[in-house]
From Swiss-Prot:
Pfam families: Pel9A-like_beta_helix (PF22842). The keyword Acyltransferase does not apply. PbH1 repeats lie at residues 125-154, 156-185, 189-214, 216-238, 249-283, 284-305, 312-334, 397-420. This is Uncharacterized protein YwoF. Residues 1-27 form the signal peptide.
Length: 468
């Protein structure tokens, strides 16, 4: 009798355990605990489960605690998302699309505002992730207002913005402002990650598609596509008065991005100027810009400071492909004597190919006002129609090292080099007068297929011993 009793008891316990495991698994899948669900067909009176989802992003944001993933079901949400709570270390709060469903946050119904108007706002929060969303169609008409797709501000940290598509954010004011992704370190920020997003077709006025500004220490901008915008693609800014202290972006990496067709030409804030950088460091420090593909912008990559007496310092611009940009390929130094400059930076192993497409005499490499103690080496430069390899129309140029570069020699084409306002129409006269490029060569680098922008070198390329 006792034997059968224990067998029966064991069976009951097993059933209870299995039921508990099933219920726990079902709860995790459906929203009780780690997951909340939102759907256009839901109700904020629901429980937030998969079967009974919430209706609004706002309600989900109020309910989401550390470790919660808010699964957003397919549809268009005509509302803004204000992230209300922080996650914790190892337990972020995540807002993302469910599986591969198409989730759109639309600004079409957002009232025209007078100040910052973001579709997603993260202020003074930490351990937050935004992923897999399309953020679009927000417009402002006032010069005092700024339309923003995703806006991070205050002392936020450990923020991940990944796999989103941002488009159609715009200002219609001639001197207005708009951003796709804007991170403003008004307080102390760290660990900001912007990865694998597409940011396109923005009307930006005087602002930038993707910007980090102020007191930000530690960031990654990687794998993004930034294209077809009417101002700067990616901007890293300091010294604008955004933060009370440490007012400059620093200690970050910008890598593996594809940035193209960003131009201010025709933008009412600039008129007929070609002044939009694909990637721009304006007063940042200790930043790596590497392995990016940057083409068909006004300026490929630029590093300087727009503020007198300030510098873009310790910037490493390496292993980038920079081609067919309107004004110049890579630029350092301020655009006039009222600006700051570039110091202690490295430009190495880049391809600068047929930039200066508008004949603006920016060449492939441009040194402007106040450049000092920079190293320019192991690059391959192919001139455009202007035939200018290096432009340097300022004498404020000291301690810069230029050597071990390859200048592409082409049949029946001469090159031009400029240094401290003096122009040289032969490689030998340029080297003799400036003492630059003593171990550099003027030769055909033998690209594998330059017509297809494949700049890998043939095995017998004379460039190999110089740059490798």
């Amino acid at each position: 009798m006792r034997k059968w009793y224990f067998i029966l008891l064991a069976g009951v316990l097993t059933s209870v355990i299995l039921a508990f495991v099933y219920d726990k698994t079902k709860a995790n899948e459906e929203g009780s605990g780690d997951y909340l669900y939102v759907s256009p067909n839901g109700s904020d009176q629901n429980e937030g489960t998969k079967e009974k989802p919430f209706r609004t992003l706002a309600h989900a944001s109020e309910k989401a605690a550390a470790g919660t993933t808010v699964m957003i079901r397919e549809g268009t949400y005509h509302e803004t998302l204000d992230v209300k709570h922080s996650g914790t270390d190892g337990k972020p709060i995540t807002f993302r699309n469910y599986e591969n469903e198409n989730v759109v946050i639309s600004g079409e119904s957002v009232a025209n505002a007078e100040y910052e108007t973001p579709l997603i706002r993260i202020h003074d929060k930490h351990d937050i992730a935004i992923s897999g969303l399309t953020i679009q169609d927000l417009s402002v008409s006032s010069e005092e207002a700024t339309a923003i797709g995703i806006y991070v501000s205050g002392s936020s940290s450990h923020i991940a913005i990944k796999d989103n598509h941002i488009r159609g954010i715009k200002t219609t004011a001639d001197e207005g402002n708009a951003h796709g992704i804007a991170v403003y370190g008004t307080g102390s920020m760290k660990d900001i990650r912007i990865e694998d997003n597409t940011v396109e077709k923005l009307t930006l006025g005087a602002s930038e598609a993707v910007v980090l500004n102020g007191n930000i220490d530690g960031f990654t901008v990687a794998g993004n596509v930034v294209r077809n915008n009417n101002n700067i693609g990616i901007d890293l800014i300091g010294y604008e008065g955004t933060a009370d202290k440490n007012d400059y972006v620093r200690n970050g990496v910008v890598e593996n991005n594809t940035v193209y067709q960003n131009s201010t030409y025709g933008n009412p804030a600039y008129g007929d100027e070609y002044s939009a950088g694909g990637i721009y460091v304006d007063g940042g420090h200790d930043i790596e810009i590497k392995n990016n593909t940057v083409y068909d912008n006004d300026i490929g990559i630029e590093a300087t400071s727009e503020h007198k007496g300030k510098y873009a310092n310790a910037i490493q611009i390496t292993d980038n492909k920079v081609y067919n940009n309107a004004y110049t390929g890579i630029s350092i130094g301020g655009y006039d004597k009222k600006r700051g400059g570039t110091s202690n930076s490295l430009i190495a192993r880049n391809i600068m190919y047929r930039n200066d497409t508008k004949g603006l005499y920016g060449g492939q490499l441009l040194l402007q006002y106040d450049t000092k103690n920079n190293t320019i080496e192991k690059n391959i430069l192919t001139a455009g129609d202007s035939r200018l390899f290096i432009g340097n129309d300022f004498t404020e140029n000291e301690g810069n090292t230029v050597n071990h570069n390859v200048y592409h020699k082409e049949a029946d084409q001469d090159g031009i080099w400029m240094w401290k306002k003096k122009e040289y129409d032969s490689f030998s006269s340029y080297r003799k007068a400036t003492k630059n490029d003593q171990q550099s060569i003027y030769a055909d680098p033998m690209f594998r297929d330059e017509a297809s922008y494949d700049f890998s070198l043939d095995p017998d390329s004379p460039a190999r011993p110089v740059i490798e």
